[in-house]
Amino acid sequence: MAYDKQALIDQLGQLTIMELADLIDGLKETWGVTAAVAVSGGGAGAASPAAEEKTEFDVVLIDAGASKINVIKEIRGITGLGLKEAKDMSEKGGVLKEGVAKDEAEKMKAQLEAAGARVELK
């Protein structure tokens, strides 16, 4: 039995919502199917890492390195801290910024690493 796919699509497009509902019910009865969503157990593990991709990062100073003056300048520029606070941060390390967008966090990391610091994004 040959059919014209486009003609069938056009005919279905002309049906009202009630007519479509009746058609679906009739097809369910004829073919013995239900509208339950099929769940695949095997693919869930592979999809998890993509779904959990982080969008916000904390910029963490690990070590100021040898050129502390340049690192202190970058810390001040990034955080807006005063000279003393930025110096203390460069000596003890810690979180410089929390909840930063990925591209902005990577930019901050690059600036600090160019100044000689060791930085992590968490």
UniProtKB/Swiss-Prot annotation:
Domain of life: Bacteria
Keyword field: Ribonucleoprotein, Ribosomal protein
Subunit structure and binding partners: Homodimer. Part of the ribosomal stalk of the 50S ribosomal subunit. Forms a multimeric L10(L12)X complex, where L10 forms an elongated spine to which 2 to 4 L12 dimers bind in a sequential fashion. Binds GTP-bound translation factors.
HAMAP family given in the database record: Ribosomal_bL12
GO biological process: translation
CDD domains: Ribosomal_L7_L12
Recorded family membership: Belongs to the bacterial ribosomal protein bL12 family.
GO molecular function: mRNA binding; structural constituent of ribosome
Function as written in the Swiss-Prot or TrEMBL entry: Forms part of the ribosomal stalk which helps the ribosome interact with GTP-bound translation factors. Is thus essential for accurate translation.
GO cellular component labels: cytosolic large ribosomal subunit
Family annotation (InterPro entries): Ribosomal_bL12, Ribosomal_bL12_C, Ribosomal_bL12_C/ClpS-like, Ribosomal_bL12_oligo, Ribosomal_bL12_oligo_N_sf
Name of the protein in question: Large ribosomal subunit protein bL12
